[in-house]
């Protein structure tokens, strides 16, 4: 073994590091822990890894706390306070409905004050009070209308189990419309005032053509009016007389009477209280026979000339039968006259009244019920006189009788005499 082999200076000597507790906490940026072996004279260059890894951000350096006593808050709070105003400037916070209403009220008050101020400055008097000093007064333009933009609010996504919240878009749209309408109204008033002002200026500067004296001038005649003092106007035509409603038509209607004459059905018209003597005349003239040679019966009951459809109970479905005869039975009138002296003195079996008038010699006997209206007397007297029942007046003991009144209300017992008068 030679001395060269045992030379201690020719070989690298490895020193064992001393194991000691680390004073500082473990940090990835500190390379003292990565190198556990220390060589004095050999420096090995670290090899670069081919793998690409995520680059780690360097740790933020911690600033020293302030030495002054005024700023006693920690650095993190200070940083947070400095950043807050930047966030407020970037993001706009939505207002609550109450704050929106307050903002609208403040805007309205401000606009009203501006309008009042503008009206005071541009106060234009009426045309009658204007003087020459007011000619040079310039009218101010209406205040500019600030455009309002409707800002829609962002609505959050709906979640289940939550109640619906009212959106603020409706309130903002209403406020915007109110703000726009108020200046438009003010602008219209100003335009109206300016138009009046220009018309007054034109009238004041125009030439005077003529003048009218309203005190001594004669009033012109107006067409379409009637002069009450003039005699030229013709008398107005009297209005047409409206015919009075006939209250007797319902109690005396016209019916059709069917009569079989030698197998031929003939139709005649009679009123309920009209006597059959009118039918006998029409039947005789139609068939060429004498009136006294006619016999009429209803189901084998003879019908006389003094009977009426109401007295025999004739209806529209009944049919009468007529025969030509030469017995001349109709000439025996004395047997059927009711106003002979014996018949008038005899006590009647039924209730009846007597009507006396200048038109006939003997009173007219009319049988009726106590509960019937006096309309029957009016109608029968009109049929006897062949006139309108509205022209007849009836009096009992000097009192005028109402057609709707009844004998029972007048305390009649029978055979009372009623006076008849005809209207002039």
UniProtKB/Swiss-Prot annotation:
Signal peptide location: none
Modified residues (Phosphotyrosine): 26
Swiss-Prot/TrEMBL GO biological process terms: double-strand break repair via homologous recombination
Coiled coil start-end: none
Protein location: Nucleus; Nucleus, Nucleoplasm
Compositionally biased region (Basic residues): 48-57, 156-166
Protein name: DNA repair protein Rad60
Gene from which this protein is expressed: Rad60
